[in-house]
UniProtKB/Swiss-Prot annotation:
This is Queuine tRNA-ribosyltransferase. Its cofactor is Zn(2+). Residues 245-251, 269-273 are annotated as: RNA binding. InterPro entries: ArchSynthase1/Queuine_TRR, TGT, TGT-like_sf, tRNA_ribo_trans-like. Catalyzes the base-exchange of a guanine (G) residue with the queuine precursor 7-aminomethyl-7-deazaguanine (PreQ1) at position 34 (anticodon wobble position) in tRNAs with GU(N) anticodons (tRNA-Asp, -Asn, -His and -Tyr). Catalysis occurs through a double-displacement mechanism. The nucleophile active site attacks the C1' of nucleotide 34 to detach the guanine base from the RNA, forming a covalent enzyme-RNA intermediate. The proton acceptor active site deprotonates the incoming PreQ1, allowing a nucleophilic attack on the C1' of the ribose to form the product. One of its GO terms (cellular component) is cytosol. Disulfide bonds: none annotated. Its EC number is 2.4.2.29. It comes from Klebsiella pneumoniae subsp. pneumoniae (strain ATCC 700721 / MGH 78578).
Length: 375
């Protein structure tokens, strides 16, 4: 992987990730394909929304279908027939999400398989091996996603262990002869001094890119913005920056303003299945009765398959009847909305007009622009 940085506007960056499998224009949003599928979508449909890279889930694909089935096909690209690059998370966040059924030690994480209850152990080395078999174009280190709220002492211990796991991840990744990219993950909760230690330690180990982890886990938006403003300038400028698990459209805008290059989130697909649709002027809850006889498209400014062909009334009808097509059409639209937003951000950075784009984005939704505390 090669990262090319074209231009900046304030702290925002316009560039691209170059892989053997294709080019990803940044800032980029990555749809999430947890089980080897972006829910309800064929790879061709995902590509048609403008997505150039997707995310797969190491933890879930390890449990089902498992490494051996994956290797029978070649790798995850061959298994799911996605031709572009794939980033896989390490499984750390999913283990964090297991809560009481897991035990974290220095060696790794002991937990019970949520499918059948069998005891399982996952550590940095195993995570690197699974992601190697998946053929991931971007591999994420294995870390502990520090919960929120966490006091300073807990956050410090967690961050320090994640640093040790980062070194173990790096060593196993290298010993496998993996030629793809490996990203470090910055932890430290909402504490700037801990984030400083984490960034410094990861940069000393050396990675192809750096993710900001442990955000969007319940902390106030002001804390997320503050941490991004503090951390991003410390990440080497020639490496991509990835904000994990984020987020709402406004979170993408605010991340870009603070120097983030990559995002992923289940929100556009999950919300689509619940009839919660993103449009230029805000949000449409398609199951509400007011859409029953609305012959207008979902978003007059959207060029997606759904908006070019169907009315709000039809989408409302499909939702009320619990038709699978409704979830699919909603997903196509939400994914396209996110890709159109990213394309707009990229163009604004190129033209040096990011802040006017941001102002228009919020004004269209009747909201005020959050403060930006950067030099």
């Amino acid at each position: 992987m090669k990262f090319e940085l074209d231009t900046t506007d304030g702290r925002a960056r316009r560039g691209r990730l170059v892989f053997e499998r294709g080019v990803v224009e940044t800032p980029a949003f990555m749809p999430v394909g947890t089980y080897g599928t972006v829910k309800g979508m064929t790879p061709e449909e995902v590509e048609a929304t403008g997505a150039q890279i997707i995310l797969g889930n190491t933890f879930h694909l390890w449990l089902r279908p498992g490494q051996e089935i994956m290797k029978l096909h070649g790798d995850l690209h061959d298994f799911m027939q996605w031709k572009g690059p794939i980033l896989t998370d390490s499984g750390g966040f999913q283990v964090f999400s297991l809560g009481d059924i897991r035990k974290i030690t220095e060696q790794g994480v002991h937990f019970r398989n949520p499918i059948n209850g069998d005891p399982i152990f996952l550590d940095p080395e195993k995570s690197m091996e699974i992601q190697y078999d998946l053929g991931s174009d971007i591999v994420m280190i294995f870390d502990e996603c520090t919960p929120y709220p966490a006091d300073w002492d807990y956050a410090k211990r967690s961050m320090e262990m994640s640093l040790r796991w980062a070194k173990r991840s790096r060593d196993r990744f290298d010993s496998l002869g993996n030629k793809n990219a490996l990203f470090g993950i910055i932890q430290g909760s909402v504490y700037e001094d801990l984030r400083d230690i984490s960034v410094k330690g990861l940069v000393e180990i050396g990675f192809d890119g750096y993710a900001v982890g442990g955000l969007a886990v319940g902390e106030p938006k002001e804390d997320m913005h503050r941490i991004l403003e503090h951390v991003c300038p410390q990440i080497p400028a020639d490496k991509p920056r990835y904000l994990m698990g984020v987020g709402k459209p406004e979170d993408l805008v605010e991340g870009v303003r603070r120097g983030i290059d990559m995002f992923d989130c289940v929100m556009p697909t999950r919300n689509a299945r619940n009839g919660h649709l993103f449009v230029t002027d805000g949000v449409v809850k398609i199951r509400n009765a007011k859409h029953k006889s609305d012959t207008a498209p979902l978003d007059a400014e959207c060029d997606c398959y759904t908006c070019r062909n169907y009315s709000r009334a039809y989408l409302h009808h499909l939702d009320r009847c619990n038709e699978i097509l409704g979830a699919r059409l909603n997903t196509i639209h939400n994914l396209r909305y996110y890709q159109r937003l990213m394309a707009g951000l990229r163009k604004a950075i190129e033209e040096g007009k990011l802040e006017s784009f941001v102002t228009d984005f919020y004004q269209r939704q009747g909201r005020t622009v959050p403060p930006l505390n950067v030099d």
